[in-house]
């Protein structure tokens, strides 16, 4: 993954939760809901139709791992996947676990406020909290 803007914005090497052969799962700097991630293809291509059969098959495994991890460790009940690719022209998903109750973790209370604007005014999550989330989910 060599897209410099993506690297600067999402810091995948630093915020990596799990790496697969074709995909990388990274914590989002803005934790709208606990466990928000970016799931990104590790090569640059702007079109979903350019995904190979192997990459598509592995994406199923990636999402199974991610959803099971969030359910078991964080108490998530469902997930929202967004793949707009309006600014970053390569295949990646913003994934938001959803919750039906408040979660107390890392000396913080996390509440799913049924976010309608996932990219709105949420502040960046502090790096030490992001690292705790990453280590907890590994």
Feature locations, PLM:
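HIT superfamily nucleotide-processing domains
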Residues: 1-138
């Amino acid at each position: 993954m060599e897209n410099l803007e993506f690297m600067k914005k999402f810091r995948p090497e630093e915020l990596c939760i799990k790496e697969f052969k074709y995909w990388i799962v990274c914590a989002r700097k803005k934790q709208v809901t606990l466990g928000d991630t970016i799931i990104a293809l590790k090569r640059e291509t702007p079109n979903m139709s350019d995904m190979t059969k192997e990459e598509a098959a592995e994406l199923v495994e990636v999402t199974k791992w991610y959803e099971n991890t969030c359910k078991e460790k964080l108490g998530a009940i469902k997930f929202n996947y967004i793949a707009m690719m309006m600014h970053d022209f390569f295949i990646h998903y913003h994934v938001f676990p959803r919750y039906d109750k408040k979660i107390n973790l890392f000396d913080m209370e996390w509440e799913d406020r049924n976010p309608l604007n996932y990219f709105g005014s949420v502040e960046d999550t502090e790096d030490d909290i992001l690292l705790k989330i990453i280590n907890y989910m590994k």
